[in-house]
UniProtKB/Swiss-Prot annotation:
Residues 165-168 are annotated as: G4. This is Sulfate adenylyltransferase subunit 1. It comes from the Bacteria. Residues 110-113 are annotated as: G3. Pathway: Sulfur metabolism; hydrogen sulfide biosynthesis; sulfite from sulfate: step 1/3.
Amino acid sequence: MNNENELLRQDILSYLEQHEKKDMLRFLTCGSVDDGKSTLIGRLLHDSKMIYEDQLAAITKDSKKVGTTGEKVDLALLVDGLQSEREQGITIDVAYRYFSTDKRKFIIADTPGHEQYTRNMVTGASTCDLAIILVDARGGVKVQTKRHSFLVSLLGIKHVIVAINKMDLMDYSEEVYKQIQEDYLKFAEQLDIPDIQFVPISALEGDNVVGKSEKTPWFDGTPLMEMLENIEIGEDDNLEDFRFPVQYVNRPNLDFRGFAGTVVSGQVAPGDEVTALPSGKKSKVKQVVTFEGDQERAYVPQAVTLTLEDEIDISRGDMIVKSDNLPLLNTQFKTHLVWMSEEPLMPNKQYLFKFATKSTPGVVAHIDNQIDVNTLEEADAMHLNLNEIGVVDVKFTQPVACDPYKRNRPTGSFIVIDRLTNGTVGAGMIIDEIAGDAQHTSPNFSEFELEFNALVRKHFPHWNSVDISKL
């Protein structure tokens, strides 16, 4: 019995060690309606042996009732989980699925293709490293294909695989494949996507999805799964700009005061000179503390506690950065804004803007233009409606430390919260600061009030008192 327990323990340890060393790729699938997004994900799960027997039996049964593939098992039903999705044969919600191979772990976001669900797609794409854009070989590059590509570019996704699907319906024609490739690359010249790859597939038949197909001898590339396993995403991490939004002031006893949070970009080590923003106070890193003990260096995306050599005033929402590499610090910024509420965006209405751990009141001071996501044309607008995207000027009541979104996604993004309903109504990406408004005036507090407020925040951080010197 003891021998069996030991073997079981060794198997568990071996399994954990194997998966611990794998890196993870987050990707989304997007494309026009009925291009086969859900079928492709079902094929990836099926061919990578990630479907249990009871799941396969269930979708085999459902295929006879609501399937769209005739006598074959409708693999899209693995992903289209909502009853309304199955009955209509479309994807509405963002469906997340997880699978792994010997080389890598994956999280898939299957996003809806309809224009009225743009906000769902933006939500699914916001954390992804790569996008698979499906193009129906029968119809080529459509308006929806261009819209999804624009959104992928807007959200800073650097890797795109254009999967030209349903090649079986076009007799695996090389001419069709090359024409679509040419059309897409011509359109993509307007976008900021540095890495674009192409693959001809049939999600229904499995051609070039996991294994290389004999039906496309003219294609000298690798199958889709091999692309996903081998694409390099480590270089996308920003290791240059150290940014550490403070989540919590950790003070377990009178002898220890640290600042807990996650390194969202860059790296830091004891001895590095840092600046706390927005106060501008400087110090040096004393320790990098983790659950497993002190570390010589902290990297993105580690969660750590930093201690400093000096007792400077830092609270939740502040950002610790290296003194020789400062972010933008201002009260006004030009941004891209995706509106997600059925109530239209009204300029000069008070909203709450949340950056990482910092929340600050503010307004949309001006809508520069609205971007037509289908044609990329810009037009004047008085307000933004649900699923519309615009370039807007935002103004906050206090300075905010952030970076342009294209340089640093974690510190260049924010969400907009309705102060009345507490619902998320928008998502934004910083383009740049608006010069000439870096000045900030504070209400007149007495010296005693300022000192007392600092004392309370230092010794009772769990009270979450507001720093009145920043009001």
